[in-house]
């Protein structure tokens, strides 16, 4: 019953202070939502946040590593008041239960660390980000993953500026493996992320107008 379902949201922002607190229950969710999982990656982190802020009907899942990145990059999750934030506070990642009840039509994991991608490929779900990815897959929820390690040599943003990184072969192989997962679209750039999100929005608008 509804009393056994986990709470819909926990507050979090870049300083650990309360940000938004959801009071609605699963039964109150009339319209399926976007889910967005933040991991511990700083790769185009600010750009990913900009895209995230433009989405309607949004829930944001913040892993413990993501909360650290938010502080390091001096970012704040300034989002519309109706956005719900979930903090990684329990070993079982209780908020993922919402996927069973049709609360989400789309999951976006962006940006995704090589560690997150590796765990997703291996079927390991031991934090909030990997848990929501696993549950989205089990519930056939289409998922977009913005992978960080996609080329042998890359420029990425560190807290103090751009740096050069050289992803390992295993990192590149895991990104390729993830592309074969059901209901999963892997993107490799901010431009591709924007295009994938826009395509999803257009599909949803078409589906809503025909229903």
Regions of interest found by a model, annotated:
Residues 1-24, 210-211:
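N-terminal amphipathic/basic-hydrophobic helices that include classical n-h-c signal peptides
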Residues 20, 24-210:
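A cross-family phosphate/adenosyl-ligand binding-site feature
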């Amino acid at each position: 019953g509804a009393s056994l379902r986990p709470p819909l949201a926990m507050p979090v922002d870049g300083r650990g202070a309360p940000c938004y607190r959801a009071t609605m229950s699963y039964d109150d969710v009339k319209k399926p939502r976007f889910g967005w999982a933040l991991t511990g990656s700083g790769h185009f982190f600010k750009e990913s946040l900009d895209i995230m802020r433009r989405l309607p009907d949004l829930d944001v899942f913040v892993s413990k590593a993501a909360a650290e990145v938010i502080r390091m990059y001096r970012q704040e999750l300034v989002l519309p008041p109706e956005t719900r934030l979930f903090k990684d506070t329990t070993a079982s990642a209780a908020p993922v239960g919402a996927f069973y009840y049709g609360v989400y039509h789309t999951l976006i994991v962006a940006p995704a660390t090589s560690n997150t991608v590796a765990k997703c490929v291996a079927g390991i779900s031991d934090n909030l980000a990997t848990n929501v990815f696993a549950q989205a897959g089990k519930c056939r929820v289409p998922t977009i993953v913005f992978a960080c390690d996609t080329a042998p040599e890359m420029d990425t943003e560190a807290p103090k500026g751009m740096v050069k990184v050289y992803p390992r072969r295993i990192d590149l192989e895991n990104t390729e493996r993830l592309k074969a997962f059901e209901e999963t679209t892997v993107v490799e750039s901010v431009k591709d992320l924007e295009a994938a999100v826009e395509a999803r929005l257009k599909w949803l608008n078409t589906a809503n107008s025909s229903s």
